[in-house]
Every structure is written in C-alpha cells, then in structure tokens.
Amino acid sequence: MTAAPAPTASGTQTLARGLAVIHSVAAGTRDLRDICARIGVARSTTHRLASCLVQERYLRVLPGYGYTLGPRLIELGFQAREDIPLATLARPHLEELARASGDTIHLAVRDGADALYLEKIPGKKGLEMRSRVGHRMPLAVTGVGKALLLDGDELEWLAMLHAGAPVSPRAAGNTLPEERFLDRMRDYARAGYAFDLEDNEPSIRCVAAPVRDASRTIVAAVSVSSTVPYMPMERMRDMVPIVQEVAAAISGELGWRPATAQRRPAR
C-alpha cells in the first residue's frame, strides 16, 4: 500500500514561518543554522523560506556576513510611515495622558527654529494657553522645543536661544544667560526630557520628552503643560517618567525600540 503523502503546511503556517524568519534576522541572526534553531523549523524548510524572501527582496545575503533585512522592508517601512500621519498614531497616547493628568497636552515637530504644533488637547483646569494647532513657537523657550533639540550640540542650542523671543513680552525677563541655558540643556540631554519654567508664558510650566523614529532620530516631542499652582517642581519631577513613557509609546509606533532591545549581529 502506497503511503499517503505528508501533509503540506497550510498557507497560514507558511506565512507565520516566513515572518518568523524575518523576525529572526531582524534580531541579529545571520546564518541559516542559527535561524533554524531560533524558529524551530527544519533546515530544508527554513532554506526554502529564506530563499523565497531573498528573491522577493525581503531579505538579502551579504558574502561573509550572512542574512540581513532587505530593501523591500525598507520601502514598506517608509510607506507605512507616510500612510498614517504622526498625529494619528500619537492621538490615542496623547488622549490617555490627558485623561490621566487633566493637563494640556501638546505634540510638536521641528520647523526650522520653531516648534510646530500638530496636536493640542486642552486641560480640564480652566486655563487657556496661546498654543494652537498649526502655530509655531521658538524652540529654545518651549518645553517641546527644547525636547526637539536634545540631540543637538551646544552651537545649535545657542543659535536657537538667539533665534526667537518668548511669545509673551512679560516672559522676556526669564530668558537665561547663555551659560545657564547651556547648563540646563546639558542636563536635559543627559536625562532625556526638558522643562519650560515660565520661559515662554508667565505662570505656565511644561514637562516634555522627545519622540524618536526607527533610526533613533528625534522627530517630534510631547508635553504636559499647566500653571504654576498645578505644576510645582515636585510634580514636574514626578511627571518626567510619565511623559517619557508616553513619548516612548509613540516612538514605538514609529518603529523605535529601546537600546536594550537592540541585539548585536551574530558573528
């Protein structure tokens, strides 16, 4: 009696295995043997899947190095980023932060020497701020602006300090001397957040953190803002990890991963 042919993997199973190969390579696995061990699939099947992925440009093979992610994934990544605007991706996270804090929430991107506001969720405490969606404010005097500058150097920081004035003339007296401004920016850059201590509007304080994309580049910043009575220094310090967590969640939507999750290529 002729033995029945072995059942072939279903389309869903094949897809899942193909994705497992891609994820394995993305995690730093470079040779076929290690990919097999990582995903728990026979060598012949893994080789067939990897060959198909190379042919379709989802993977590529570099001599002396092994498998790497292919150009098709780069193309799809950029397409995915363009298909869904940043503000749309960020909105659920901003709304959650607004509910938790009761304060005004901002999302901004850099536009030259200014912070351009993409989103604003007003707070529940009855105060009104000058910020508006589509408006610009100087980078060096806003919390989101400083957060957008955290990867810059000191020459850029000083250039931005002199590039714009606070939106309120009454806040002009709060402008810091160059060295004090640099000291603060150094501290902010080391810690990954920024404060607005009434630098732009009297009595308005802000806690901000940068948003990064898959390349770890700062592409936006998120902030929580309120008046001094609602935002004493103790609360500002307490808000830092909360705002950073929201910024990290938005960054994750853009493909960013924490440094500890980045694996070195296998040698």
Write out the residue ranges for each language-model feature.
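N-terminal helix-turn-helix
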Residues: 1-88, 252-256
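Short, structured helix-loop boundary elements
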Residues: 11-15, 70, 83, 87, ...
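Short amphipathic alpha-helical signal-transduction/dimerization elements
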Residues: 26, 145, 149, 153, ...
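A cytosolic small-molecule/anion-sensing beta-strand core signal
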Residues: 63, 111, 220
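All-alpha effector-binding/dimerization core of bacterial HTH-type transcriptional repressors
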Residues: 81-126, 153-154, 163, 184-187
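Short, solvent-exposed recognition segments
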Residues: 127-200, 267
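Extended hydrophobic
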Residues: 173-247, 266-267
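Short, highly charged C-terminal tails/helix-capping segments
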Residues: 256-267
